[in-house]
């Protein structure tokens, strides 16, 4: 039976379809019947299903040809999701969803888009694909909320991870799909059929058409779908996807790849949008996230292995191809950002090989791939790069060998090889062929590539430093072969290899470097020289024995190479000379040999300064003697000169080079070699004196001087006549007026020769004590020597400065070695004349400095060689009197000369400097003593050191230092230590820096000289003098000069002594006052000590010794010294830095004493002295940088707090220093809070946060606050999850700071602004707070919260919401709650109730912005709360709304419910019965335009509309609840609420159009109860509601139902209200009563007219009566009200006119008369009302019906009417009045016609009407004209 019914129903549907003629009809039928018809497919009866199929076929034909017909998609989607539906039904349903969805308007598609997503869950893959195909085009048109909150999104995807994944995969395929791609299926079908039986189809899918790059066949097929998109549509789809991702609808992490692929799109719009989005997210994306990187690799490479993880073979149609080159070019730059990408093996190497050698690669991709190789080399960790190395190297070498087109690319490849070698040297060590290949490439490649090869080779050097045996020999040969290549870069790299690959004592490589040192190009020879001249062992403590080749071996090697080269074309020709090497290389060779010689002799090998080299001559001499005596010979190689001793070979090489090219260093080396062992070596040059003379004639002054010395050494080996002739020849050459150069050379040679002769003579005398044997030869020789000396003397007054200086030098050399062979006094050239002449030159401004220096030296030498020198004191006095200002160097020379002259023959100046060192020298036993040191000391101490002239004092100090240094063992010096100390102390307070430094050095020396008792006395005197500032007694007039301003030494506190006071206090603090001397020795910061003169004092050695003695005090010293290095006083800073550099040689010392240093600095940060505070800040700034501070984490809070205090210092420079220290401290702390630091990081955070939050952020100092916040933000970024335990303290503190740190002026402005301005301003303030760094930090913390932290955080948060001060704080709290609901919803559930009750306080905040924020938060919070909490909240809100009269409560209810509806729609649906009735009531709130009620109404309306299935459906659904709430509203004490309830009731009645019991009774009872009592504002709404309900439910009211008011009761109540005095209310009451009477057709006209008619009459009287005394405005208002009443009254009379003959009989005449009177007298508005009432009156007048005829009565009424209506017909002004009058006449004529009562219309009436109608013939409105003419014609016809 049921089946028959089903079929019948289907037949009827068929029939309806057949009858449907228009699209609209068809659409209506489909909308109504399609879903149920589809459900019939689940029928078990074949017949029914068949019928359905028939119907669907018919339907499909009709639908397809009519694209505009809409299908009931929404209903179909609901049906599709029904879990109970059978698959047959769902399969057909989706067909119509697919057909209907694209036809929908775009807005509707957007609305249904979320439903499509929901519908997908658990459905078969093809159907899911179809739904996504429908969804994707819609995304372009979707509107997303501005706030990117997950719960606010239209797609609530957070709970649908599977759907998200499906969607993302599909989107990826859409983005990969190229425009205009066509899937050629036909070909695939043919192929697949033929391939079915064959097993050879091995996964390649030969039967499957080629999918687009990056896609599988299946992916392409599903994107194309049933209705392929056009290119334009596809572009829109792609843009929609980008928009979707932009709106953060899916997790950012998941969508990164999509943006990367979209950014490679061929259409500009898509690529640009994706690029912009990628850029904006750049900082948020973690490129080291394996999930992101693996996805990129997968898309880039496609499915390379055909096996899935489980080992099953991947189906060919699912196999993805690699992406196109265009996409690859976008992916690789992102891989370059990622450390993870570099580590992911094997994908990294696959990408490299694909980019370099793939089939579709291009030069751009190759370049990027090479960059990726660089990236791997730099970032890949050691363990992970090992397996990659060989593959990378193979790839790179292959590229280098095969790819030659692009030089830039090749350059990158070579660079990559270099980087790889520095990471993995073991790969390269064995492969010398690769080096050769690169060297060859360097020779042949393009210039732009060479630089990269050069760089690569330079990096590779390190890989070959461990070569041995054959490999090393091979490398030697390789380097040698490339050192002679024409390309400069090749030679440069070869030098690098020679210097780095081999050890520094490797002879063949040194030889190669020596050859390179002769290279014409600076970059080659400069590098070679740098390596060769690098002094070994200077900075190393270990033995230097293996760091240079041994001298003999090196000499033999060079000799062998030289002799070989002489036989080959590589020899060098210069003039007539042939050299084995070019001059530059040869020069470097001999210098290097000299360095090897020095090294082998055990001294520091230097080649920079000849004077330094000469200091080592005695040691070298000893070594040479050893070599000569050991008889060491060369190996049996060919040796042209036959010399086999290395020294002889060395001298031979020097001779060869000197003869060919010359050069000062070569000359020196030869001179040195011969001078140190003249007896053996000089004799060989006796026969070469002419050659030596030629060297003496050189154009260079220094060369002549050295040659003259050389000549004197050679000559000194001869004697007798040979010597005589040589000296005579020299005298002759000197006197001959040759060129000045020849004279100069001869003059020097003469002096040196005579000097050596005298020295020899003196030595013989002391040795033999036997003068007799040589007596016979003496007179002759003495005469010759005297002649020579006089000859030299004659040149002293030469006009040539050159010759004068030479004469001076020569005389000095003679005087140093023996008594001058000239008279002491008298006329002519005497010793007195000579002394006076030389002394006169010192102050002379005509003389050069060189002349002055030589004159002083010479004077100092006279008493040295002559024990009986008569003018010793004269000479000394002269030297001491010749002080000149600012000639410091000269004073050091004078000091030296005074020292030599004072001690006379015992001076070290008398020694042979080539053979004896200063330390080794002892004066000859028989020398006469001429010591005048006591006298000199007395003159200096008692005359010069206390001179009023500061220059004299400075000079005296330098002389005194010289005396103490050089004569430290002299008894006179030792016995005057206190006086000398006193003298030095007096100079300490000089304003001149050098004077201070000299004095401090002197003090150190004095202390070292004393015995224990002396030292104690010296220390106490010094400390007393320094610390008390007691002046030195003999400095009488010094006071005025000592502290004169402007000199270097002046310190900020105006005391020259401040540096020394600090040193003294430093020593005293250590309880070791004597250490002050050590400090003074170390405080060596004047440049003077680095000069030749200064260095001679040997203070470096003293300083080293002092450093060693101070070592035990380092723990106490290091902290103080560290701080002193940053002292603002320059003098102190330099002195202390000097001491520091001397003491702290080990870099780790600071780390060792870190705690002590820190303790000292923190203590001194708050010192009373600003200088100390500033230096402590600066020192702290330096200390904290770049060192691990794990051990001092506990100290950090103290440092922060102290620096915060100093940041507010009174002195600006201290404040700046503190700011600098704080910035550094901040950076260091941020680094320490990195998760990589582990437990140390945790400890740091725990230590820092309380300090930064309580002290920093709450500081009154702006800078401190700013820095604290900045630091917190950075810490939160770097610390990550480590912040979790501290969140309960950190988050509330930061929330408080949002208000504390806001400028207070904003609060002031907010208070003064209007409501509208205030809201806008507060909104902007809250927005600024939310984007502030503090909020940024809070958001960072929130990521890591969970249940372990919430228990502590929530109570604090609640407290802050309730008692927090300030807009920012409260708004921030709300924002935090919102974030918590999304970050940890499950964990939050137990605490939601507490948070809700806290937020309730915010809901009633007077500030609308805070109120909105709290409502917004509450809207999110209900999602995580328990049902019981939510119910309590809703009850609370309900209570507020119904009971509280303040607008603030109503607003908060609207905002909260709206927020719940928007952000937690599911919660609202679950509690719809509580919420929606309230929303319905809220919708009907009576809006006050000035207030925000209009906005609230809109919010309520939105809640209602979004949660009910149409308003009618909603009312039906919640009728019970709606009535309950409206009843409650009506019973409210508030008039406004009563009125609101009434409006809501009226709305229910209107929209339902009929109410059934018992609801009708409930509503009416409630309304009638509300009517009782006095009139109140808004009571009118009750009346309107009653009228609405009665009108809508009149039929139901006819029935008698218990508890339902009867019609009679309703009328009684309403009529009662009509009698109320309030006219405005009365108008509504009368209108309501009329509506009720009309609806119920009740006859209550008597009562009604008794109320209304008197008022109409009264109104007429008043309006025609006398004006009242009220003011004009009130009058106007009253008139308007009366007019309104009149209109209403007439309208009501018309409506209330009953269908009762008796009543009509009683009132018809009166009513007609009343209307006619008003028609004649009133304004047009009243006339119009009266006419409308008249129309209703005649419409219901029973006299005009045949059965109730009364001709007489009717005639009377008609006459009355016709007389008055003519006024209206003839009203020319208002056409509306004419129109209404015509309708009345038309109605009358019609009624008379129907009742056949024409006779009642008398002729008088007709005439009146015809005349009036005639006036309308020219009417302006044609329709009226026409109607009037028609009626006139009708009337005329009656006659």
UniProtKB/Swiss-Prot annotation:
The modification Phosphothreonine is found at residue 830. Its main location: endoplasmic reticulum. The modification Phosphoserine is found at residue 824. InterPro entries: ARM-like (IPR011989), ARM-type_fold (IPR016024), ARM_ECM29 (IPR055444), Ecm29_N (IPR024372), HEAT_ECM29 (IPR055443). The keyword Phosphoprotein applies. There is a cross-link at residue 1033 (Glycyl lysine isopeptide (Lys-Gly) (interchain with G-Cter in SUMO1)). One of its GO terms (cellular component) is centrosome. Residues 187-211 are annotated as: Disordered. HEAT repeats lie at residues 28-65, 107-144, 162-205, 326-362, 387-426, 429-466, 469-507, 683-720, 721-759, 783-820, 829-868, 870-907, 931-969, 975-1012, 1013-1050, 1112-1149, 1152-1189, 1194-1231, 1243-1281, 1285-1323, 1348-1386, 1390-1427, 1517-1554, 1558-1595, 1605-1642, 1646-1683, 1779-1822. It is found in: Endoplasmic reticulum; Endoplasmic reticulum-Golgi intermediate compartment; Endosome; Cytoplasm, Cytoskeleton, Microtubule organizing center, Centrosome. Residues 187-201 have a biased composition (Low complexity). The keyword rRNA-binding does not apply. GO terms for biological process: ERAD pathway; proteasome assembly. It comes from the Eukaryota. Keywords: Cytoplasm, Cytoplasmic vesicle, Cytoskeleton, Endoplasmic reticulum, Endosome, Isopeptide bond, Nucleus, Phosphoprotein, Proteasome, Repeat, Ubl conjugation. One of its GO terms (molecular function) is molecular adaptor activity. Adapter/scaffolding protein that binds to the 26S proteasome, motor proteins and other compartment specific proteins. May couple the proteasome to different compartments including endosome, endoplasmic reticulum and centrosome. May play a role in ERAD and other enhanced proteolysis. Promotes proteasome dissociation under oxidative stress. Belongs to the ECM29 family. Non-stoichiometric component of the proteasome; associates with the 26S proteasome. Interacts (via N-terminus) with VPS11, VPS26A, VPS36, RAB11FIP4 and RABEP1. Interacts (via C-terminus) with DCTN1, DCTN2, KIF5B, MYH7, MYH10, MYO10 and ARF6. PANTHER family: PROTEASOME ADAPTER AND SCAFFOLD PROTEIN ECM29, TRANSLATIONAL ACTIVATOR GCN1-RELATED. This is Proteasome adapter and scaffold protein ECM29. It comes from Pongo abelii.
């Amino acid at each position: 039976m049921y089946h028959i019914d089903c079929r019948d129903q289907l037949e009827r549907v068929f029939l309806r379809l057949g009858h449907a003629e228009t699209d609209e009809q068809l659409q209506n039928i489909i909308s109504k019947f399609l879903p149920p018809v589809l459900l019939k497919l689940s029928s078990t009866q074949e017949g029914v299903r068949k019928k359905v199929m028939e119907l669907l076929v018919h339907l499909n034909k009709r639908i397809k040809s009519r694209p505009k017909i809409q299908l009931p998609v929404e209903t179909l989607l609901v049906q599709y999701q029904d879990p109970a539906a059978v698959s047959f039904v769902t399969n057909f349903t989706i067909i119509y969803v697919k057909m209907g969805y694209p036809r929908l308007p775009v807005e509707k598609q957007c609305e249904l888009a979320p439903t499509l997503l929901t519908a997908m869950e658990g459905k078969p893959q093809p159907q899911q694909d179809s739904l996504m195909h429908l969804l994707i085009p819609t995304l372009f048109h979707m509107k997303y909320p501005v706030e990117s909150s997950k719960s606010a999104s239209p797609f609530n995807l957070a709970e649908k991870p599977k759907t998200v994944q499906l969607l993302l995969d599909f989107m990826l395929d859409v983005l990969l799909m190229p425009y205009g791609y066509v899937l050629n299926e036909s070909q695939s079908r043919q192929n697949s059929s033929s391939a079915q039986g064959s097993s050879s189809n091995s996964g390649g899918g030969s039967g499957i058409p080629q999918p687009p790059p990056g896609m599988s066949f299946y992916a392409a097929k599903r994107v194309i779908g049933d209705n392929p998109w056009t290119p334009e549509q596809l572009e829109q789809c792609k843009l929609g996807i980008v928009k979707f991702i932009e709106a953060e609808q899916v997790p950012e992490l998941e969508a990164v790849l999509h943006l990367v692929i979209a950014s490679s799109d061929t259409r500009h719009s898509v690529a640009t949008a994706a690029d912009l989005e990628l850029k904006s997210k750049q900082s948020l994306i973690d490129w080291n996230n394996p999930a992101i990187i693996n996805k990129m690799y997968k898309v880039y490479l496609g499915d390379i292995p055909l096996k899935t993880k489980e080992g099953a073979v991947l189906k060919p149609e699912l196999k993805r191809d690699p992406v196109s080159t265009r996409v690859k070019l976008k992916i690789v730059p992102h891989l370059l950002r990622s450390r993870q990408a570099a580590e992911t093996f094997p994908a990294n190497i696959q990408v490299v090989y694909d980019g370099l050698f793939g089939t579709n690669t291009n030069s751009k991709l190759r370049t990027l791939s090479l960059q990726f190789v660089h990236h791997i080399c730099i970032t890949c960790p050691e363990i992970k790069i090992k397996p990659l190395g060989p593959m990378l190297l193979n790839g790179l070498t292959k590229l280098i060998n095969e790819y030659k087109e692009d030089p830039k690319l090749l350059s990158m490849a070579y660079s990559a090889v270099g980087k790889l070698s520095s990471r993995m040297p073991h790969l390269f060590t064995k492969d010398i062929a690769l080096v050769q290949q690169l060297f060859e490439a360097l020779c042949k490649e393009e210039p732009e590539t060479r630089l990269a090869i050069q760089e690569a080779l330079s990096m590779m050097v390190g890989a070959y430093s461990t070569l041995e045996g054959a490999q090393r020999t091979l490398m030697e040969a390789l380097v040698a072969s490339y050192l002679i290549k024409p390309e400069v870069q090749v030679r440069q790299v070869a030098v690098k290899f020679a210097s780095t690959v081999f050890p520094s004592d490797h002879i063949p490589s040194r030889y190669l470097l020596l050859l390179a040192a002769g290279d014409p190009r600076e970059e080659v020879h400069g590098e070679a020289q740098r390596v060769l001249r690098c002094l070994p062992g200077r900075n190393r403590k270990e033995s230097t024995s293996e760091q240079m080749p041994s001298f003999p071996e090196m000499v033999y090697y060079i000799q062998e190479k030289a002799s070989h080269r002489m036989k080959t074309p590589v020899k060098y020709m210069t003039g007539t000379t042939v050299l084995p090497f070019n001059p530059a290389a040869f020069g470097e060779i001999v210098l290097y040999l000299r360095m090897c010689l020095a090294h082998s002799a055990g001294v520091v090998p230097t080649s920079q300064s000849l004077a330094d080299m000469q200091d080592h001559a005695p040691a070298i001499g000893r070594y040479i003697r050893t070599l000569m005596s050991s008889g060491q010979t060369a190996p049996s190689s060919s040796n042209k000169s036959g010399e086999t001793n290395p020294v002889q070979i060395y001298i031979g090489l020097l001779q060869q080079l000197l003869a060919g090219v010359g050069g000062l260093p070569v000359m020196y080396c030869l001179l040195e070699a011969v001078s140190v062992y003249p007896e053996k070596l000089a004799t060989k040059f006796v026969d070469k004196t002419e050659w030596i003379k030629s060297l003496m004639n050189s154009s260079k002054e220094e060369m002549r001087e050295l040659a003259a010395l050389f000549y004197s050494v050679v000559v000194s080996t001869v004697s007798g006549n040979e010597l005589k002739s040589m000296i005579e020849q020299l005298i002759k050459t000197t006197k001959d007026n040759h060129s000045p150069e020849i004279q100069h050379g001869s003059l020097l040679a003469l002096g040196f020769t005579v000097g050596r002769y005298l020295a020899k003579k003196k030595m013989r005398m002391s040795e033999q004590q036997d003068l007799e044997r040589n007596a016979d030869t003496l007179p002759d020789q003495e005469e010759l020597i005297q002649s020579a000396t006089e000859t030299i003397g004659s040149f002293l007054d030469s006009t040539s400065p050159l010759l004068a200086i030479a004469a001076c030098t020569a005389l000095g050399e003679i005087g140093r070695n023996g008594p001058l062979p000239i008279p002491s006094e008298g006329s002519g050239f005497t010793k007195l004349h000579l002394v006076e002449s030389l002394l006169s030159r010192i102050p002379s401004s005509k003389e050069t400095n060189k002349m002055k220096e030589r004159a002083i030296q010479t004077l100092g030498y006279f008493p040295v060689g002559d024990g009986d020198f008569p003018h010793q004191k004269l000479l000394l006095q002269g030297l001491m009197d010749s002080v000149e200002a600012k000639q410091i160097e000269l004073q050091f020379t004078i000091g030296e000369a005074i020292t030599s002259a004072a001690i006379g023959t015992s001076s070290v100046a008398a020694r042979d400097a080539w053979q004896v060192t200063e330390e080794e020298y002892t004066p000859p036993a028989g020398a006469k003593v001429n010591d005048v040191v006591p006298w000199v000391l007395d003159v200096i101490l008692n005359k010069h050191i206390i001179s009023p002239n500061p220059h004299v004092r400075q000079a005296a100090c330098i002389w005194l230092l010289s005396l103490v240094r050089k004569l430290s063992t002299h008894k006179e010096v030792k016995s005057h230590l206190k006086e000398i100390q006193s003298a030095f102390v007096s100079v300490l307070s000089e304003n001149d820096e050098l004077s201070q430094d000299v004095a401090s050095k002197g003090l150190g020396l004095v202390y070292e000289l004393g015995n224990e008792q002396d030292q104690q006395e010296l220390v106490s005197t010094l400390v007393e003098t320094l610390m008390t500032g007691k002046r030195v007694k003999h400095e009488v007039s010094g006071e005025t000069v000592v502290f004169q301003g402007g000199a270097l030494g002046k310190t900020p506190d105006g005391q020259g002594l401040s540096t020394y006071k600090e040193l003294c206090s430093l020593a005293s603090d250590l309880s070791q006052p004597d250490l002050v001397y050590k400090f003074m020795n170390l405080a060596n910061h004047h440049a003077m000590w680095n000069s030749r003169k200064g260095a001679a004092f040997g203070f470096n050695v003293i300083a080293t010794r002092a450093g060693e003695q101070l070592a035990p005090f380092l723990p106490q010293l290091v902290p103080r010294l560290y701080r002193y290095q940053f002292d603002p006083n320059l003098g102190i800073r330099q002195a202390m830095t000097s001491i520091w550099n001397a003491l702290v040689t080990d870099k780790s010392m600071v780390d060792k004493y870190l705690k002590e240093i820190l303790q000292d600095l923190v203590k001194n940060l708050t010192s009373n002295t600003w200088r100390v505070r500033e230096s402590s800040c600066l020192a702290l700034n330096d200390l904290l940088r770049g060192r691990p501070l794990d051990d001092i984490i506990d100290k950090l809070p103290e440092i922060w707090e102290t620096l915060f205090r100093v940041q507010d210092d009174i002195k600006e420079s201290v404040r700046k220093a503190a700011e600098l220290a704080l910035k550094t401290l901040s950076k260091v702390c941020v680094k320490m809070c990195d998760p990589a630091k582990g437990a140390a990081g945790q400890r740091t955070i725990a230590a820092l946060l309380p300090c930064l939050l309580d002290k920093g952020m709450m500081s009154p100092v702006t800078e401190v606050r700013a820095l604290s916040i900045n630091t917190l933000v950075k810490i939160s970024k770097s610390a990550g999850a480590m912040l979790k335990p501290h969140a309960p303290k950190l988050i509330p503190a930061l929330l408080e700071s949002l208000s504390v740190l806001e400028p207070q002026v904003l609060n002031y402005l907010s208070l003064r602004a209007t409501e509208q301005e205030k809201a806008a301003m507060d909104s902007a303030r809250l927005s600024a707070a939310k984007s502030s760094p503090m909020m940024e930090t809070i958001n960072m913390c929130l990521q890591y919260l969970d249940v372990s932290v919430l228990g502590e955080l929530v109570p604090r948060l609640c407290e802050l919401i309730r008692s927090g001060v300030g807009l920012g704080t409260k708004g921030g709290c709300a924002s935090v709650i919102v974030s918590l609901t999304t970050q940890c919803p499950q964990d939050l559930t137990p605490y939601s109730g507490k948070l809700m009750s806290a937020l309730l306080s915010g809901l009633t905040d007077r500030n609308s912005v805070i109120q909105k924020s709290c409502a917004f938060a509450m809207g999110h919070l209900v999602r995580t709360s328990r049902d019981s909490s939510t119910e309590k909240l809703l009850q609370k809100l309900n209570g507020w709304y119904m009971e509280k009269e303040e607008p603030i409560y109503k607003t908060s209810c609207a905002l909260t419910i709206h927020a719940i509806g928007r952000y937690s729609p599911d919660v609202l649906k679950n509690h719809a019965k509580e919420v929606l009735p309230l929303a319905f009531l809220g919708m009907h709130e009576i809006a006050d335009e000035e207030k925000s009620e209009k906005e609230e109404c809109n919010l309520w309306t939105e809640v209602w509309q979004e949660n009910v299935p149409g308003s009618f459906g909603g009312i039906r659904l919640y009728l019970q609840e709606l009535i309950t709430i409206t009843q409650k509203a009506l019973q409210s004490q508030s008039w406004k609420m009563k009125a609101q309830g009434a409006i809501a009731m009226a709305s229910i009645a209107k929209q339902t159009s009929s109410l059934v019991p018992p609801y009708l009774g409930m509503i009416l009872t409630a309304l009638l109860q509300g009517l009782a009592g006095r009139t109140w504002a808004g009571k009118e709404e009750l009346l309107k509601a009653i009228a609405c309900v009665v009108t809508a439910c009149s039929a139901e009211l006819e029935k008698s139902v218990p508890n339902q008011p009867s019609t009679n009761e309703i009328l009684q109540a309403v009529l009662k209200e009509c009698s109320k005095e309030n006219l405005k209310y009365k108008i509504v009451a009368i209108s309501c009563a009329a509506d009720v009477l009309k609806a119920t057709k009740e006859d209550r006209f008597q009562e009604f007219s008794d109320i209304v008619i008197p008022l109409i009459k009264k109104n007429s009287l008043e309006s025609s009566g006398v004006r009242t005394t009220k003011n004009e405005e009130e009058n106007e208002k009253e008139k308007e009200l009366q007019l309104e009443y009149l209109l209403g009254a007439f309208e009501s009379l018309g409506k209330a006119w009953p269908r009762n003959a008796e009543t009509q009989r009683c009132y018809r005449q009166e009513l007609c008369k009343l209307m006619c009177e008003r028609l004649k007298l009133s304004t047009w508005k009243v006339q119009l009302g009266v006419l409308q009432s008249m129309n209703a009156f005649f419409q219901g007048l029973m006299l005009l019906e045949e059965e109730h005829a009364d001709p007489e009565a009717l005639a009377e009424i008609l006459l009355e009417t016709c007389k008055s209506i003519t006024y209206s017909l003839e009203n020319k002004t208002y056409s509306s009045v004419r129109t209404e009058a015509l309708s009345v006449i038309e109605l009358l004529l019609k009624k008379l016609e129907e009742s056949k009562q024409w006779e009642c219309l008398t002729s008088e009436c007709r005439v009146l009407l015809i005349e009036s109608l005639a006036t309308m013939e020219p009417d302006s409105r044609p329709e009226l004209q026409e109607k009037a003419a028609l009626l006139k014609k009708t009337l005329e016809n009656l006659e």
